[in-house]
A protein has these predicted regions:
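Conserved N-terminal glycine-rich FAD pyrophosphate-binding loop of Rossmann-like flavoproteins
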Residues: 213-241, 379-402
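Flavin (primarily FAD) cofactor-binding/catalytic cores of flavoenzymes
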Residues: 181, 204, 209-211, 252-355, ...
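N-terminal Rossmann-like FAD-binding beta1-loop-alpha1 element of flavoenzymes
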Residues: 174-208, 356-365
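A short hydrophobic beta-strand element
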Residues: 99-110, 288-290
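A solvent-exposed, acidic/Ser-Thr-rich amphipathic alpha-helical stretch
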Residues: 22, 34, 38-100
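Short, low-complexity N-terminal intrinsically disordered segments enriched in polar/charged residues
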Residues: 2-46, 50, 169-180
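Short beta-strand edge/turn micro-motifs at domain boundaries
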Residues: 2-8, 14, 107-109, 114-171
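A short, basic/flexible loop-to-alpha-helix module at the beginning of a structural domain
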Residues: 155-181, 332-345
């Protein structure tokens, strides 16, 4: 009984503390709102700490933009405040502010003139350190969900009424042939599918074109052993989560089947067997003319918005080594690798040392193939178990059981400014290096050249900066440590009739050469489909401008050209991993919906082009 009284007292004290903290935060939000409503920029900016960050996902800027420091915040407010008219800043329903290590954190809601928003604020010493504001929905153009979901059935007597299937068939037969889509998405992988699903729920006429025969074939057609290296909790699509018994790491064919199912149940207008041939922008009509070939027949589409969702791994980067035309054996890019089965008893050289190279080498070894990896530059490796532990607070079964939702996890991750993210990641990877010291020592003894990024900030920063240069270890590293997969470090001088010659004179005999040499930027597709001039106009896609390897400066603060307006009106890029495809599809779809409905979308801070395609 005495313990019960102690527990009750502690619970009461915690409740009072939460109530007091909530009251303080709401008073702070009220003061912030009053300054914004009054247009008092001095008062509003003074509520931010000297080091501060405001990341806005569409709500204020109609852009994806991070303001770093008080001066940038003042400039944004000076430009956007009159149009946005933000108000009703509140602690989010069923949420309470929390305090730890001198930082108060709180989920918030707010409104603008045209939208409702959600955000996350962090205070230090009574001032804003980080603020995330995101657009959730457009007023008057909300998704039909929950209480407003479609009825589906037509009850009562309705002479001549069409069934759901008849209406769906009619739409399928007309869109793109008798009526035009407002949005055309080129690429039907997870990026195009996630965006298509969002636009479908928002009532925006959209067609997704995919060159493969079935949805999901972009996964099915990859090498046999491919599985996702990200865990299931990180990889949900919008609206439909994976079942609770879904494997932690999804095999490629299972993901392919899920994507195919998803396109059907989400009622996407998905054209398979369709290749985009050419596109032109008509500035007078503000529309695109896109010629596609569908099942051998050319069709001309006239969308207002064109989205490239061709993927980070869709345009193979095939090297041009001297002597490739003389090789007597089989050679192909890793994207065309059929799997290991037909190579048993042969010698295979895999040029490259990132994810695909490791996966292919491991599968070849397991199939009884004599396989050698050629490492041309350093590679960052992190064990899958260690990576999962580092994100377990957001994406794990433990996180789910603790009340963490996918949407919240995404927003927490999005709320961390890129400018300081490397500082937050470095101690994570310092610990991983310490915990996995024996693992890394074994790789070093085997001759593997390791890195942890230019500033030791690890996997996520390397991915965000360049999208390459790493391997999430699911077993291949031990094969290298044990010498079962042979490793050679060096640069390729030429391909000979019988193998590979390195600059140090070493000869590697080969029956098969696999070029696991990565992929080029998505705007390479712009050059192919539209023109080189257009690709140069929009500039490089991906990267932060961190001035690290393969991510030249100046600092951009956000991913170049991704999920936001580009220098070409009506041209957009969408993609990334499953997490990014899910999360950012929300904000790209709202930008497109607003334009479809004629909602004013004055873009603040359109990204200048510093690097051509």
């Amino acid at each position: 009984m005495q313990q019960l009284r102690k527990d009750q007292k502690a619970s009461w004290e915690e409740m009072m503390l939460d109530t007091t903290l909530n009251a303080r935060i709401q008073a702070f939000l009220d003061k912030f709102e009053a300054a914004l409503v009054a247009g008092d920029l001095d008062a509003a900016v003074a509520m931010f700490a000297p080091e501060c960050y405001w990341r806005d996902l569409v709500a204020f800027t109609w852009n994806i933009k991070t303001m770093e420091g008080r001066d940038q915040i003042r400039e944004m407010l000076n430009s956007c405040l009159a149009q946005a008219k933000p108000r009703n800043w509140k602690i989010a329903d069923a949420e309470s502010a929390t305090e730890a290590d001198g930082v108060i954190e709180c989920w918030i809601t707010f409104e603008t003139e045209v939208a409702r928003g959600y955000g996350l604020v962090r205070l230090q010493n009574g001032q804003i350190w980080t603020l995330l504001t995101t657009m959730v929905e457009l007023k008057g153009h909300e998704e039909k969900a929950g209480f407003t979901r479609p009825l589906g059935a037509r009850h009562g007597v309705n002479p001549g009424a069409k069934t759901w299937k008849e209406l769906r068939d009619e739409e399928t037969e007309q869109l793109g042939l008798k009526t035009q889509p407002y949005v055309l998405i080129i690429g039907g992988g997870q990026g195009g599918i996630a965006l298509g699903a969002r636009l479908r729920q928002l009532g925006v006429p959209t067609i997704i074109v995919e060159k493969n025969a079935r949805p999901g074939d972009s996964w099915r057609n990859r090498y046999k052993s491919l599985c996702l290296h990200d865990p299931v909790w990180y990889d949900h699509l919008p609206y439909i989560d994976f079942p609770k018994n879904w494997p932690v790491f999804s095999p490629k064919d299972k993901i392919g089947d899920w994507l195919e199912m998803y396109t059907k149940v989400m009622e996407l207008n998905y054209w398979t067997g369709t290749t985009a041939k050419h596109a032109d922008w008509d500035d007078a009509k503000k529309e695109w003319t896109v010629v596609v070939e569908r099942d051998g027949k050319e069709i001309t589409l006239k969308p207002k918005q064109l989205v490239f969702a061709t993927g980070m791994s869709a345009k193979p980067n095939m090297p041009q080594f001297k002597g490739m035309d003389t090789f007597k054996g089989e050679q192909h890019h890793s994207s065309r690798h059929p799997g290991p089965d037909r190579y048993k008893g042969k010698k295979v050289v895999v040029i490259g040392s990132n994810n695909s190279a490791h996966d292919i080498c491991a599968a070849l070894y397991e199939a009884g193939v004599d396989v050698t990896m050629v490492q041309r530059s350093t590679t960052h490796i992190v064990r899958s178990d260690s990576l999962m532990a580092s994100i377990a607070d957001l994406y794990s079964e433990r996180a789910v059981r603790g009340g963490m939702t996918t949407a919240k996890a995404d927003l927490i991750f999005a709320s961390l400014p890129y400018k300081i993210l490397h500082q937050l990641q470095k101690p994570v990877y310092d610990k991983i290096r310490q915990d996995d010291a024996d693992f890394y020592a074994g790789l070093t003894r085997a001759g593997f050249r390791l890195d942890f990024g230019d500033d030791d900030s690890g996997l996520f920063m390397k991915y965000l900066r360049r999208g390459s240069g790493y391997y999430i270890d699911v077993g291949a590293s031990q094969l290298i440590i044990d010498g079962k997969v042979k490793l050679v470090a060096g640069q390729v001088e030429e391909i000979t009739p019988n193998g590979v010659r390195l600059y140090d004179g070493k000869e590697l005999p080969a029956d098969v050469i696999v070029y696991a040499t990565g992929y080029s930027s998505m705007n390479g597709f712009v050059a192919d489909l539209i023109s080189r001039d257009m690709a140069d106009k929009v500039g490089k896609v991906w990267g932060l401008g961190s001035n690290t390897t393969k991510d030249p400066g100046p600092w951009e603060g956000e991913q170049r050209n991704m999920w936001k307006p580009t220098q070409q009106e009506g041209l957009w890029f969408h993609g990334g991993n499953l997490h990014q495809s899910r999360h950012y599809s929300q904000f790209l779809s709202l930008q497109l919906k607003a334009r479809y409905e004629g909602v004013p979308t004055p873009v603040y801070g359109l990204q200048p082009v510093h690097h051509k395609a």
